[in-house]
Amino acid sequence: MPKFVQQKIVSKETGVNQEHPLIVGTSAGLVWFTASQQWIELEGHGVTAIAPSLNGLWVVVDGKSVWHRDCEGEWQVVAPSIQDLQLNCIQPLRGKVLVGTSNAHLFWIVDGGIEFIQSFDTAQGRDEWYTPWGGLPDVRSMAGGQSGELYANVHVGGILRSQDRGRSWQPTIDLHWDVHQVITVPDRPGVVLAATAEGLATSTDRGDTWSLDRANLHSTYSRAVAVCGETVLISTSSGPSGAKAAIYRRSLDRAGTFEKCDRGLPQWFSHNIDTGSLVTLKDRTVFGTSNGQIFLSEDAGLIWKQFASDLPPIHCLNFS
């Protein structure tokens, strides 16, 4: 069981809550920010997905393997490279860990073993999944609901839902909306949100029905979504290239009221603020960019400040 020593970068006041460090997955390691210190772990590795849990931290390393960090800071490889698949996203759920991959597969990590979910490979509508460039589809993001339901976002294949812990899967949304991220809202049972190429998609009935909101957006192409209290935030750009990217916010319950976040932010970003790069904790909202910047808001996205810069390209971030 290898243990990787924390390498300190700098000690200074960061403004991050001491109890919930900010963890940033970059192309060159996992960067930690506490209230007074910064350090890097897994140096030299690309960290492409992060998932905190009660028993530690789960990450995808170099897109190929799953690593676990226990509460003592020890790292262990729990799923090495698997069948030449790229591992895209990870979701701890009730003692197991769900992983989404390239070629649109899912598998569980259970007791150190790997169990592929065959029912997902035969899900209704799978033969219609595609990518805009003609390649094989991916599982891009996942979420868990309060009643035990699971949601898996296929790019491009919509959002599939399981209500029996992964034994069966059903499509829930128009797959042509091109979903990039799906999330649930912890204190809103039944609410599911998705960042799509057509704007923000919302369901209030666990995915049975959906509505789109794109009012006031400069463009509908959205890559990331998060909820901070009663506020929903999305990242939007002019398209896959990421030109004219921005963050928008609105009340969770008031469709049609998006406002562009501009206080403390550049007018536009030149690259997409991507899936997994926009996260919240209580009143705090944080996002990272592909050129190594982090921006922080302490009032649900109303006012922002640059929190860090000159990091390696950021793939994902989260609070522990």
Predicted regions and their residues:
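Extracellular glycan-interacting surfaces
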Residues: 1-320
